[in-house]
Amino acid sequence: MNRQKITWLQILQGWSMLLVVIGHVTLTGIFENPQTPVSATIERVIYSFHMPLFMFISGFLFYFTKISRDLAYKEVVFDKLKRLGIPYLFFTFFTFAVKFIFSPFMKRPVELSLRQFTDSFLYPSSNPLSEMWFVATLFIIMLSYPLLKYMITGHFKIAVLIIGSVVLNLFFPPDIFLLCLSNVAYMFLFFCLGILFCKFDIQRFLSHSGSLLLSLLLFIALNLIPDCPILLLNLTGIIFSVSLCLNLTPIVSGLFSSFRDYTFQIFLLGIFPQIAIRILYSKIPQNELSYWSLYIISILLGIYLPVFIAKIVEKIPNKLIRCCFGL
C-alpha cells in the first residue's frame, strides 16, 4: 500500500471519528430531540452509517495488517487481546468507578455488584461504557480470522461470503444481546467489505470527482426517502465517505492530522468530557447561544482532551499503562 493510499485511509479514520464525536453530543440527553431539529437531523444522518463505516475501516486494516501477512492465528488473537481486551477491561473498571461516584448525574447509574460486572462482558451493550459494544463486536468478528482468510481465496468462496454476510445482516434476530451476537451478525458484512476493498483495491474506482458527486447525490436522495432500508443508507454512507476522503487527499493531505492517529483513544475517552458538557447544559439557562456554544465545545473537548491524555500516556514508560489506553 503506497503512501497516498495510507493518507486517504488516515483521513477516513479522522472523518469517521469526527462523526462519532458529533453523534455523541446530544446535549439534551434525548436522541433526535424534536425540540432541536437541526442537531436531530445531524444525528439521524450520522447514525445511518457511522458505525458500519468504522467496521469497514477495521476490516480494511485487518486485511492490510494481518491477513495479507498470513499471520498465525494465535498471534492475531494475542495481539487483539492486548489491543482490545486490555482497554475493554480497564475502561469497564474505570467507568464503573466514575458512574458510581457521580451516580446522581448519570443517565445510566451502576451498582457495584458481581452480576453487573459479569454482565458487562457477557452482554457488552450493558457495559457502563455503552460504546464498548463495538469493541466486543469487533473482537468477536476478528476471531473468525481463519474463516475469513479461507473465504477470500477464490471467486466462488467470496460470493458465498458476501451472500452469507448479507443474509446475516438482514435476517439474524436483532435481540440476541449475549456476546453482542446480533451486532456481530449485522456488522460482519461491513467488516468483510473492508477486507475485500483492501484485497482488490476497489477504492480506486471511487477516487474521481464524478464518483464523489454521484455517491453524494445518492446518499442525500436515500436519506430523504422515508423509511429507506437502513442497509442502503449504511452502504451509500460508506461509499460516499471513501470517495470523499480519496478526493480530499491530493488537496488537503494533512486533514484531521491533529487527531487522526488517536481515533481509538478518542473513542474510549471522548464520551467523558461530553457527558460533563451535557450536565453543564442542564444547569444553565438554555437558549440558542448556549446550545450551539456548548455543542461546539463538546465536539472540541470530545476530540482534543483524549488526544492530550494520549500524548501524556505515550510518554509513560510502563507498557501495561499504555496498553490500557490502547497505545
Set out the residue ranges of the language-model regions:
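Alpha-helical transmembrane segments and their immediate juxtamembrane cytosolic regions
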Residues: 1-327
